[in-house]
Design a protein with these regions (language model features):
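Acidic, mature catalytic/reactive cores of soluble proteins
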Residues: 1-199
Length: 199
């Protein structure tokens, strides 16, 4: 916090965990494979809430901690205080795919998509909102970089279409659920001035 005190961990039988620090440890390669697995298990235990739309940004700290940015200016489940923040969830998925945790990355992406497409829950036009609140309602449809990160992750990690020194490289990481009934999955995109349909 602003006073140099540890923020995450166990406090009075309450676990405090934030997704942001975990994402950057995974994405940067700082966390080794065993640590990434431990992060996944902890995130599933303490941050994942399917009804709210996926991975919450943090657990409930059960206090108003005003020396930690603006997050505690909001009730738990809103904005930076415990909402399912789409951008960070997609970055979590991207980091997991990069590190080979495909099933875990898929879960993060798919839960966001399922919630956004469930109008009775999200109450928002299909798309990725800035965040889902405690009830799973999508908030602020156009105030997020999550959509571009979602597309980046689908193209470069899920379908595995990347450029490398001018060459087109394919390294798909699709899971069974992403294929249709005929066993097909495909993507159409532009690369080096050409249009490709990859199936």
């Amino acid at each position: 916090d602003n006073h140099g005190n540890r923020v995450e961990g166990k406090y009075d039988n309450n676990v405090r965990m934030m997704l942001t620090g975990q994402v950057f440890a995974i994405m940067s390669g700082t966390a080794d494979e065993k640590q990434v697995q431990a992060v996944c298990e902890s995130a599933d235990t303490y941050l994942y809430d399917k009804d709210a739309g996926g991975y919450r940004l943090n657990t409930n700290f059960h206090e108003n901690k005003f020396d930690l940015g603006r997050m505690f200016g909001f009730a738990y489940g809103e904005k930076e205080n415990g909402a399912v923040f789409s951008h960070m969830t997609v970055m979590y998925a991207n980091a997991l795919y990069q590190r080979g945790f495909i099933r875990e990355g898929y879960k993060a992406l798919q839960t966001l998509a399922d919630t956004a497409l469930d109008f009775d829950t999200s109450r928002i036009y299909p798309g990725i909102p800035e965040y889902f609140n405690a009830e799973g309602r999508g908030m602020y449809a156009y105030l997020t970089g999550a959509a571009s990160w979602y597309m980046l992750t689908l193209i470069t990690e899920v379908f595995g279409v990347k450029g490398s020194f001018g060459d087109l490289v394919l390294e798909p990481k699709l899971v069974k659920e992403q294929f249709d009934d005929d066993g097909n999955a495909g993507i159409r995109l532009e690369f080096a001035g050409n249009t490709f349909v990859i199936r």
